[in-house]
């Protein structure tokens, strides 16, 4: 091990740590070349991919906002249509109820008038039968009274 330390000391130039030889500019050139190579081979494709993803995300967000706005607009339209349909159905139901009520009243009026006419006809028939019965009773009463008078006079 001792020989390695001697070897390391022997390789060190006389200027020390800040000795200006060709190593420092060579390293600077290597860093610049490596930067250009990495820029061409790695940073540009990665940057392009990142930009593409950002573009995709921004277009996706814009499309999502448009779809959300469209969905909200459609929801508002459908709510308005539903409200209109409910109003129309209420109007139709009220109209139907009024029509049923009108038809019921008409049918009731017709039935009452028919019942009144049947009742009047029956009353007329009853009165005619009553008059006929009274006339029949009167004639029978006259016959009976004349028969009684004849028997009383004959007796």
From Swiss-Prot:
Major localisation: membrane
TM region positions: 23-43
Protein location: Cellular thylakoid membrane
UniProt keyword annotation of Methyltransferase present: no
Oligomeric form and interacting partners: F-type ATPases have 2 components, F(1) - the catalytic core - and F(0) - the membrane proton channel. F(1) has five subunits: alpha(3), beta(3), gamma(1), delta(1), epsilon(1). F(0) has four main subunits: a(1), b(1), b'(1) and c(10-14). The alpha and beta chains form an alternating ring which encloses part of the gamma chain. F(1) is attached to F(0) by a central stalk formed by the gamma and epsilon chains, while a peripheral stalk is formed by the delta, b and b' chains.
Annotated membrane topology: Single-pass membrane protein
Name of a matching Pfam family: ATP-synt_B
Protein role: F(1)F(0) ATP synthase produces ATP from ADP in the presence of a proton or sodium gradient. F-type ATPases consist of two structural domains, F(1) containing the extramembraneous catalytic core and F(0) containing the membrane proton channel, linked together by a central stalk and a peripheral stalk. During catalysis, ATP synthesis in the catalytic domain of F(1) is coupled via a rotary mechanism of the central stalk subunits to proton translocation. Component of the F(0) channel, it forms part of the peripheral stalk, linking F(1) to F(0). The b'-subunit is a diverged and duplicated form of b found in plants and photosynthetic bacteria.
Domain of life: Bacteria
Keyword Transport: yes
GO annotation, cellular component aspect: plasma membrane-derived thylakoid membrane; proton-transporting ATP synthase complex
Family: Belongs to the ATPase B chain family.
One GO MF term: proton-transporting ATPase activity, rotational mechanism
PANTHER family for this protein: ATP SYNTHASE SUBUNIT B', CHLOROPLASTIC
Protein name listed in UniProt: ATP synthase subunit b'
Keywords associated with the record: ATP synthesis, CF(0), Hydrogen ion transport, Ion transport, Membrane, Thylakoid, Transmembrane, Transmembrane helix, Transport
Gene designation: atpF2
């Amino acid at each position: 091990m001792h020989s390695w330390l001697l070897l390391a000391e022997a390789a060190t130039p006389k200027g020390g740590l800040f000795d200006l030889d060709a190593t420092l500019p060579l390293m600077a050139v290597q860093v610049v070349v490596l930067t250009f190579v990495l820029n061409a081979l790695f940073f540009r494709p990665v940057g392009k991919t990142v930009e593409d993803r950002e573009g995709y995300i921004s277009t996706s967000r814009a499309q999502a906002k448009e779809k959300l706005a469209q969905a909200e607009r459609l929801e508002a339209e459908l709510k308005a249509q539903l409200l209109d349909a409910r109003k129309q159905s209420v109007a139709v139901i009220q109209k139907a109820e009024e029509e049923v009520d009108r038809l019921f009243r008409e049918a009731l009026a017709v039935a009452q008038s028919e019942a009144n006419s049947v009742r009047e006809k029956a009353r007329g028939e009853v009165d005619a039968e009553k008059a006929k019965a009274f006339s029949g009773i009167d004639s029978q009463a006259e016959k009976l009274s004349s028969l009684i008078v004849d028997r009383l006079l004959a007796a």
